[in-house]
Swiss-Prot record:
Keyword annotations: 4Fe-4S, Amino-acid biosynthesis, Cysteine biosynthesis, Heme, Iron, Iron-sulfur, Metal-binding, NADP, Oxidoreductase
Cofactor note: Binds 1 siroheme per subunit.
Organism encoding this protein: Geobacillus thermodenitrificans (strain NG80-2)
Residues noted as binding [4Fe-4S] cluster in the record, renumbered to the chain: 438, 444, 483, 487
EC primary class: oxidoreductase
The protein, known as: Sulfite reductase [NADPH] hemoprotein beta-component
Catalytic function, reaction form: hydrogen sulfide + 3 NADP(+) + 3 H2O = sulfite + 3 NADPH + 4 H(+)
Gene name, Swiss-Prot/TrEMBL: cysI
The protein's annotated pathway: Sulfur metabolism; hydrogen sulfide biosynthesis; hydrogen sulfide from sulfite (NADPH route): step 1/1
Lineage, highest ranks first: Bacteria, Bacillati, Bacillota, Bacilli, Bacillales
HAMAP family according to UniProt: CysI
Quaternary context: Alpha(8)-beta(8). The alpha component is a flavoprotein, the beta component is a hemoprotein.
Length: 573
């Protein structure tokens, strides 16, 4: 297939655009709908708006068929996402989230791939109380979902250096500046009260977004080389911190990343952001705003599957988009500066910071904080939060850093880690430590197959092959998503599985270990037996034929197993 050439949007605006336009800045009839006692669900128009408030209406798909037989409405429930720039939460905030999860949700916390909290299983009657409790802890769900700028990501441990701390401050500034200004959120959930300490939001109009906000979601992430833990090239705006003489000189600016696609539609594809220049720290907020307004004005509002910024850039041309950004800025971006990425994973266990504090990175399988019969992760973290004087940092790989532990507190924290058996993951294979999975079934309405619930079981079987080939400590990234939307940034994993139907997956190989190259479709619509058969051959070859220091993703390309993807527009070649 030739390189994809996208048509200009020439149809009428999609129905979602009507909903936004008529919503009176995200109000709609949400206030009335949420008070309606007749149904546990809400109408579709309001559900579209609900996303901007940080929540999705879902249902328990495990019982959907049975409820249909009984002529009952679906087991409706809400997912609520908490916006935490850079993934930072205080111990007090952690304890509030823990309490909310047990009181109003399904008793678990999900740490997301965008460094946010998710609550699942919240019933309609408890949504407002949940929102109020979250805001009472000086957090918000506003713009955690929807056609707006989402949670701003950055390296999760700002106290590794002064640069990390500074980058985190810029992530917070970007997050606050690009937050919607509507009062609707406060009117509906907080009875129009402003909570002290939360970002200032006031005014009736949206000076940046306008009445219809953006054509689709928008994502920003900041990476600090050599770590690409935020997968900076998957972002609509990827900012690469440039450090010179130990100081933050500024950011290389990359635009147009995105992982989502639609099965069978070759006009949709994942894409990596491309570097267009450099800006200084004091310019970065203005640069991000102007980039976002280009997408606001030129993005496809007719066909939502082609509405992300990556498609706008590929349709108009990178240079055209760059020129328009610079026209709006009134000045030209600087020349991009050298940088180098080594990996996109986390560093586990204890790490000493530059200021005498300690940080413990905890492995959290699937990002799910819960208590099982034999592993009391949720209880252990609750007890740590009660005595911890530093903070918690959610990583982009669904793990958790117990950060800024003082020397005086370290022994106490270590004792609690030991008491509850909390793990840094080092007893697992490196493959498992480098795994990611989205939520998928039973709550996600888009999921075509399992992900979070299934990947650990599949890994049990893959690890047998890993051990047979002496690869237990070999760092290989593996990710699974229940659909092709890419919440777990699937095609940036060296081995990736994308749900096609229940028990069936498309298998991708060949992404770069450092997140700088997309994977390629290797096998389509395969089940567990074929997955294991393929991996048995591939991993055996890798163990025998790899070069010194060669990563698995590089090996499968060099060996001719898959073709290298050089750009998203030829992803389907």
């Amino acid at each position: 297939m030739a390189k994809v050439v996208l048509k200009a949007p020439d149809g009428p605006p999609s129905d979602v655009e009507r909903i936004k336009r008529e919503s009176r800045y995200l109000r709609g009839t949400l206030a009335e709908t949420m008070e309606d006692p007749i149904s546990a669900g809400i109408p579709d128009d309001d559900n579209r708006l609900m996303k901007f408030h940080g929540s999705y209406l879902q249902d328990d798909r495990d019982v959907r068929t049975e409820r249909q037989k009984q002529k009952l409405e679906p087991a409706y429930q809400f997912m609520i996402r908490v916006r935490t720039p850079g993934g930072v939460a205080t111990p007090e905030q952690w304890l509030v989230m823990d309490e909310i999860a047990r009181k109003y949700a399904n008793g678990t916390l999900k740490l997301t791939t965008r460094q946010a909290f998710q609550l699942h299983g919240v019933l309609k009657w408890n949504v407002k109380k949940t929102m109020q409790a979250i805001n009472g802890a000086l957090m918000t769900t506003l713009a955690a979902c929807g056609d707006v700028n989402r949670n701003v990501m950055c390296n999760p441990n700002p106290y590794q250096s002064e640069v990390h701390a500074e980058v985190y401050e810029w992530a917070k500034l970007l997050s606050d500046h690009l937050l919607p200004k509507t009062r609707a959120y406060y009117e509906i959930w907080l009875d129009d009260e402003k909570v002290a300490g939360t970002p200032q939001v006031d005014g009736e109009e949206e000076p940046i977004y306008g009445p219809t906000y953006l054509p689709r979601k928008f994502k920003i992430g900041i990476a600090v080389p050599p770590s690409n833990d935020v997968d900076v090239f998957s972002q609509d705006i990827g900012l690469i911190a440039i450090v010179e003489d130990g100081k933050l000189a500024g950011f290389n600016v990359a635009i147009g990343g995105g992982m989502g696609m639609t099965h069978g539609d070759k006009t949709t594809y994942p894409q990596l952001a491309k570097v267009i220049g450099f800006c200084t720290p004091d310019q970065v907020v203005e640069v991000a705003e102007k980039i976002m307004t280009v997408q606001r004005d030129y993005g496809n509002r007719s066909v939502r599957k082609n509405a992300r910024f990556k498609y706008t850039i590929d349709r108009l041309g990178l240079e055209v988009v760059k020129e328009e950004i610079e026209r709006r800025l009134g000045w030209k971006l600087g020349e991009a500066r050298p940088y180098h990425f080594e990996h996109n994973g986390d560093r586990y266990g204890w790490v000493e910071g530059v200021n005498g504090t300690w940080h413990f990175t905890l492995y959290v399988e699937g990002g799910r904080v819960k208590d099982d019969d034999d592993y009391k992760l949720m209880t252990g973290l609750r007890e740590i939060a009660k005595v911890h004087t530093g903070d918690f940092r959610l990583t982009a790989n669904q793990n958790l850093v117990i950060a800024n532990v003082t020397s005086e507190k370290k022994a106490e924290i270590e004792a609690l880690i030991a008491k509850y058996g909390l793990t840094d993951g080092k007893r697992y294979t490196a493959l498992r430590r480098n795994s990611l999975a989205c939520v998928a079934l039973p709550t996600c309405g888009l999921a075509m197959a399992e992900a979070e619930r299934y990947l650990p079981k599949l890994l049990d079987k893959i690890e047998e092959i890993i051990d047979e080939n002496g690869l237990r400590d070999e760092e290989i990234t593996i990710r699974m998503t229940g659909c092709p939307n890419g919440c777990a940034r699937h095609v940036l994993a060296e081995i990736a599985f994308v749900g096609k139907a229940v028990g069936k997956y498309n298998m991708y190989l060949g992404a770069a270990f450092n997140g700088t190259r997309l994977g390629k479709l290797y096998r389509e619509n395969i089940g567990e037996e074929e997955i294991l058969r393929e991996l048995r051959v591939l991993l055996a070859r890798y163990a025998k034929e790899r070069l010194d220091g060669e990563h698995f993703g590089d090996f499968v390309i060099r060996a001719g197993i898959v073709k290298e993807v050089t750009d998203g527009t030829n992803f389907h070649d």
